[in-house]
């Protein structure tokens, strides 16, 4: 079907207005555009109740005020049938829980409450089962001409058609010409030329009806070679080529014609060219065909390419001859402006090519007044058919419905297990209540509704007699269910559907009830103050005031004091320069004390008494730190008077003098090691990073037991089980006691001075004085825990943190072989130019157009994400943890069968080059053997990991298999890849190697011509069930028991799946010899 071009263009021009008009005026109906054989447009409405179609009251064009013709065509050029654009949906309002009737309009996709006509949001409604509304299932008629609209804008119409009233009348007469469908169908569309008289080549069959676009076989036109040039001016370039055409103007050729490429985009040109019907039928490019074969046009083609050029034909002649001589094919031509082609020559009108002639019809149809009557007759016949059908159905239906009743009856009795006799059935009174099943009465097909009522009557009256029927017709139980649903729906009490929220519920505690009259306007108004200019300036000031309080906090924290060397008297290392300055001031204040100390030292030299100066110094340092604490505390307090300060200083000086005096005078010279006082065991803290930075770990106080024990070790070193200490260098004259004393230098805590107490963590661990083995009172230091738990980071612990020991610590071997770290998943594709471009982007001019990475046409195989690689590789300890290991699947054999039938993607054969997302790496012929083992740790002290791993982990880490740490030598299916299975293949001297062709045992013809060596793929028998990693869940209470014994090699074969092949199953490895 080809629409009359005038009307078609007019529709397309006014399409927006038309749609708007139709929506506003006829929203109650469903409607669509349609046109008849002659290309006249109708606006077809349908009544949603009766499904009756009609021409809408004010049609699109004024001259079309008639009833609808019998044969209509849709905009998709198919026979027109009406699809509802409005669908009625029963839905539940998810707020109120009430059932409502909604109307869905497919065209503008709006949802309306059918009772109130309010627009409604589908998100707040569910269907009767409680699921979301699925509006995609409702389809509508084709109203969308948007494609054609675009094409009209690209091909601007040059002259707009304004029909004069005479032309309109003329067109109406033509439209009322009958259409003979039979003759239309007989035409061969590929029939381009038929010689009318065999010897005369001037006769062609190319003349066609201007509207319908098929060859007119009853009218034969003579070919007058003069008429192209004289009447039609066909060779006149201005007329033929200046309109917007799809082919190239032969005068302009390709170069001058910028219009075709500039004005419309490149692809649009192609769309127009290939969308048209004429092009689809013949495969060649018709623009060129016209240039080279211009003597023999196909008129059909010329017409398709010049849709806007108006054509004049002598209408009267054609009509007269058609009616008198024989009935022509439908002639429905608009009033044209130019004649189409050569005038028909009456002499040639022999009946040579007539295919079929309808008998009586044409003479009747020629007269105008009879035409509506004919159409009405057709409508009536359709109704008769509709009436016939329900009568037949009525005869068949009553039996199944009876059966449904029968089944209701029996279902109630099923719990009784006796065999049911007919007599029992008759004794039990049968009461069947069926709801009244009223269908809305449709006005036109009356017989249908009457018949349904009769059926309902029959159902109730039929007695239940033969139970045998139940068995045969059992599937008719379905109507029963529907009826029950209908009942439930009707039982919903009417008070619930309160669409306007008029009813107040009495027990609504949550909403404060108020009247609208109580709301004052002043409550709703916002106070409007002028904006202050200063505001933005004030905000930062507030921030500045708050900052010093933050800075003041670290000042209260004590600096750590560490004694580095004792040669210089007191050198103090501090964290902050501030605290250092304070300390200097403190020392200046206490110079007198230091002077006194020097005097004492000199006195000691004179009297030859052994003063343990180091201990004195330590006590002094303790005193100074205590002093510093007081100083910092005093900074926050109001300053005391100078008199008080002097008193305090004097007291302190006396204390120091007394201390030093005790040291020198009252110390008996035999006791080199002072008797330790009992000290309460300090709490130590479980390791956590922030605490360890702030706590300085001091070694424990030595006890007499400890010292005796160590001395004992030194004395009988050879006899003892433990290895003797090895690190005694030759020292200057000192006895053993002094050496030990130096090894275990410990801060003497003389006074209970107020020392800085670090903030206590919640998980504080109190260690009782327990004796581990033979080592009395040696408790594990938090520092040791810290280093033990972090051994895999090769951080050398500082000397001051180490526990006192008698052996040289072996240097930790730095791991030479460390696995390549996991490359982050967003690494570049190996053919991407990114690094290159980043380096050189300013240094060279880019000569090629860059492909837009968003362009879906170009990104085929390259930047695709890998289906197997996780977005983030799993954290290591999670991957190793045995609790999260997935159980081996007991349905193992079934899996193997699936594996065997797996559809391989087509590129498997070329899988040996690295996939696109992976960077290239150098070829490693084998994996280095594993050198380093985890250092042994005592399990008792491992707090960080709950399930303690094995002491020695023999196997290499199973890290993420999708990250290949080397280039594999053969194509691999990632799902199948097992690293452990390959252990020989990549060792030097075994297996396949690219570099040594002697290794390649099996070669095929493929290998000799294509250099790439083909190897056997991973075979079925090698596949073991791979336990895939499962992301972390809660640990199960116990490990599930494996389904089969640990070391069982084969499974007991089951009988069933072994089809025609009766040999017993044996697990063996099928080896391919290199041919795939």
Curated annotation (Swiss-Prot):
- Here the disulfide bonds are none
Compartments annotated for it: namely: Cell projection, Attachment organelle membrane
The alphabetical list of record keywords is: Cell membrane, Cell projection, Coiled coil, Cytadherence, Membrane, Virulence
Q: State the coiled-coil residue ranges.
A: 562-616
A single GO BP term for this record reads: adhesion of symbiont to microvasculature
The source's superkingdom equals Bacteria
Which stretches of sequence are listed as region Disordered?
A: 326-351, 789-808, 850-873
Q: Specify residue ranges for compositional bias: Pro residues.
A: 336-345
Comp. bias regions, Low complexity: 326-335, 862-873
Where is the segment annotated Fibronectin-binding? 264-284
Q: Describe the task this protein carries out.
A: Binds immobilized fibronectin.
* Protein name listed in UniProt: Cytadherence high molecular weight protein 3
């Amino acid at each position: 079907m080809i629409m009359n071009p005038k009307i078609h263009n007019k529709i397309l021009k006014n399409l927006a207005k038309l749609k708007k008009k139709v929506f506003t005026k006829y929203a109650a109906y469903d409607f669509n555009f349609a046109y008849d054989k002659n290309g006249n447009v109708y606006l077809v409405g349908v009544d949603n109740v009766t499904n009756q179609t009609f021409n809408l009251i004010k049609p699109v064009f004024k001259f079309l005020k008639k009833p609808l013709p019998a044969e209509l065509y849709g905009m998709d050029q198919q026979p027109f049938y009406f699809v509802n654009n409005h669908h009625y949906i029963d839905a539940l309002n998810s707020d109120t829980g009430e059932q409502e009737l909604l109307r869905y309009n497919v065209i503008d996709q709006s949802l309306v409450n059918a009772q109130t006509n309010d627009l409604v949001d589908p998100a707040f409604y569910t269907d009767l089962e409680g699921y979301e509304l699925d509006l995609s299932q409702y389809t509508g008629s084709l109203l969308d001409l948007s494609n054609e609209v675009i094409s009209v804008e690209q091909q601007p119409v040059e002259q707009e058609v304004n029909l004069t009233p005479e032309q309109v009348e003329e067109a109406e007469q033509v439209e009322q010409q009958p259409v003979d469908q039979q003759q239309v169908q007989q035409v061969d569309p590929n029939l381009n030329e038929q010689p009318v008289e065999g010897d005369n080549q001037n006769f062609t069959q190319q003349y066609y009806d201007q509207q319908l676009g098929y060859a007119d076989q009853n009218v034969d036109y003579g070919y007058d070679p003069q008429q192209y040039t004289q009447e039609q001016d066909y060779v006149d370039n201005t007329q033929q080529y200046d309109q917007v055409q799809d082919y190239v103007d032969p005068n302009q050729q390709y170069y001058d014609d910028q219009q075709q490429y500039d004005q419309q985009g490149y692809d649009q040109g192609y769309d127009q060219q290939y969308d048209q019907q004429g092009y689809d039928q013949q495969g060649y490019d018709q623009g060129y065909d016209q240039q080279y074969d211009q003597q023999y046009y196909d008129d059909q083609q010329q017409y398709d390419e010049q849709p806007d050029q108006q054509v004049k034909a002598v209408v009267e002649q054609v009509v007269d001859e058609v009616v008198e001589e024989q009935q022509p094919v439908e002639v429905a031509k608009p009033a044209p402006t130019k004649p189409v082609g050569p005038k028909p020559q009456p002499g040639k009108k022999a009946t040579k090519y007539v295919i079929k002639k309808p008998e009586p019809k044409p003479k009747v149809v020629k007269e105008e007044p009879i035409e509506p009557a004919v159409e009405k007759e057709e409508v009536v016949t359709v109704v008769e058919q509709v009436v016939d059908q329900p009568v037949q159905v009525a005869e068949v239906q009553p039996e199944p419905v009876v059966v449904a009743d029968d089944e209701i009856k029996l279902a109630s009795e099923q719990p009784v297990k006796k065999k049911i006799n007919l007599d029992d059935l008759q004794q039990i009174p049968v009461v069947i209540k069926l709801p009244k099943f009223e269908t809305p009465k449709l006005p036109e097909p009356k017989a249908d509704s009457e018949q349904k009522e009769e059926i309902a009557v029959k159902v109730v009256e039929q007695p239940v007699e033969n139970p045998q029927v139940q068995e045969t017709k059992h599937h008719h139980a379905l109507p029963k269910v529907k009826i029950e649903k209908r009942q439930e729906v009707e039982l919903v009490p009417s008070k619930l559907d309160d669409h306007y929220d008029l009813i107040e519920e009495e027990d609504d505690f949550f909403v404060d009830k108020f009247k609208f009259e109580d709301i004052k306007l002043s409550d709703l108004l916002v106070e409007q103050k002028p904006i202050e200019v200063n505001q933005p300036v004030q905000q930062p000031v507030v921030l500045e005031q708050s900052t010093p309080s933050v800075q003041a906090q670290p000042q209260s924290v004590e600096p750590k004091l560490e004694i580095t060397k004792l040669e210089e008297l007191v050198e103090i290392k501090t964290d902050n320069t501030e605290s250092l300055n304070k300390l200097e001031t403190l020392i200046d204040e206490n110079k007198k004390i230091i002077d006194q100390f020097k005097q004492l030292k000199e006195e000691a030299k004179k009297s030859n008494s052994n003063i343990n100066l180091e201990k004195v110094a330590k006590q002094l340092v303790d005193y100074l730190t205590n002093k510093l604490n007081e100083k910092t505390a005093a900074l926050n307090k109001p300053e005391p008077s100078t008199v008080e300060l002097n008193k305090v200083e004097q007291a302190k000086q006396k204390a120091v003098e007394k201390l030093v005096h005790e040291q020198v005078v009252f110390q008996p010279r035999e006791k080199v090691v002072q008797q330790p006082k009992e000290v309460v065991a300090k709490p130590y803290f479980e390791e956590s990073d922030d605490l360890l930075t702030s706590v300085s770990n001091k070694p424990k106080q030595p006890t007499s037991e400890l010292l005796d024990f160590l001395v004992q070790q030194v004395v009988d070193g050879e006899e003892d089980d433990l290895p003797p200490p090895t690190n005694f260098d030759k020292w200057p004259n000192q006895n053993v006691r002094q050496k030990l004393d130096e090894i275990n230098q410990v801060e003497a805590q003389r006074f209970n001075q107020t020392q800085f107490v670090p903030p206590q963590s919640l998980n504080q661990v109190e260690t009782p004085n327990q004796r581990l083995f033979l080592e009395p009172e040696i408790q594990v230091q938090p520092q040791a825990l810290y280093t033990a738990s972090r051994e895999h980071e090769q951080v050398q612990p500082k000397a001051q943190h180490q526990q006192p020991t008698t052996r040289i610590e072996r240097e930790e071997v730095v791991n030479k072989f460390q696995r390549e770290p996991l490359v982050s998943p967003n690494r570049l594709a190996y053919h991407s130019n990114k690094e290159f471009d980043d380096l050189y982007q300013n240094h060279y001019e880019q000569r090629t157009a860059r492909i837009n990475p968003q362009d879906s046409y170009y990104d085929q195989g390259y930047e695709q994400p890998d289906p197997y690689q996780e977005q983030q590789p799993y954290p290591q300890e999670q991957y190793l943890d045995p609790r999260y290991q997935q159980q081996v699947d007991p349905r193992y054999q079934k899996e193997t069968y699936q594996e065997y039938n797996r559809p391989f993607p087509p590129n498997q054969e070329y899988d040996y080059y690295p996939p696109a997302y992976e960077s290239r790496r150098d070829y490693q012929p084998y994996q280095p053997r594993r050198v380093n083992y985890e250092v042994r740790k005592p399990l008792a002290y491992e707090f960080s990991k709950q399930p303690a791993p094995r002491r020695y982990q023999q196997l290499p880490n199973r890290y993420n298999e999708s990250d290949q740490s080397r280039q594999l030598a053969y194509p691999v299916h990632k799902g199948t890849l097992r690293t452990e299975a390959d252990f020989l293949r990549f060792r030097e001297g075994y297996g396949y190697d690219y570099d040594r062709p002697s290794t390649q045992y099996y070669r095929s013809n493929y290998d000799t011509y294509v250099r790439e060596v083909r190897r056997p793929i991973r075979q079925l028998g090698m596949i073991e069930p791979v336990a895939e990693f499962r992301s972390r869940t809660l640990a199960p209470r116990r490990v599930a028991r494996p389904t089969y014994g640990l070391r069982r090699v084969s499974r007991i074969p089951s009988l069933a799946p072994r089809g025609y092949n009766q040999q017993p199953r044996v697990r063996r490895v099928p080896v391919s010899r290199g041919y795939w």
